Structures are given as structure tokens and as C-alpha cells.
Amino acid sequence: MNHIEKFLANDTKGFEARKELFEKISDELYAIFYENKKVDFDIDLLFEEWINQLGFLGQSIKSLRTIFYVIENEDKFLDYHLKAVKGTLIVHSERWLNHFEELTPNEALILHKVLNT
């Protein structure tokens, strides 16, 4: 079973193991969205499960950049996906601010706009 199948099965035990698997999926989504990586699986199902676990497990800069991608490309996503990622960005802002120095000026502007709406 590969990491995508494990993630979708949601049967990984232990917080650290789940967090590690989540970060692998964040890397995968980052590559799909930012590097146009071709895939042979249902991206919608993977993205949906990623959103479900984002508030609990998301911490990396790639998770944050995936959030920014959704916000910048809102026309490509369902409305509730956009609301979910913005909500996670706001509710867990202290976690995401740990990456502030790594942000591009555009990403910092997106973060500012979302946190001040």
C-alpha cells in the first residue's frame, strides 16, 4: 500500500506517524499544484481528505503554500474548500506564523488579507 492509499484508508495509528503521512501528502499536493505533477489517482478525493485533516496535522510550509494556492485559485475549487482552508488559516494562525520569514511578499499579503477579514 503506497502513502496515498494509506492516507485515504485513514488507518495509520499514532500521532507522529499520521503527521508524517500528512506531510507526505502535503508534499504531493504541492507538487501537483505548483509543479504540475501528473497523477493517476482521484485528486479530489485526496484533497478532500487532506482538508479534513489540515487543522489537526498541517504545520509545514508546503501545507501553508497549498492553502495559498487554493485561495489564489479559488475558481478551481468548491466554495466549501475555500472556506475550510481560510478557516484553518485563521483558527491556527499562530502555527502558520512560524513560517512568516519563509513567505514571499505575495504570500505574506494573502496571509494578511485573510487574517484581517
Task: List the model feature ranges, each with a label.
Residues 1-117:
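Amphipathic alpha-helical "stem/stalk" segments
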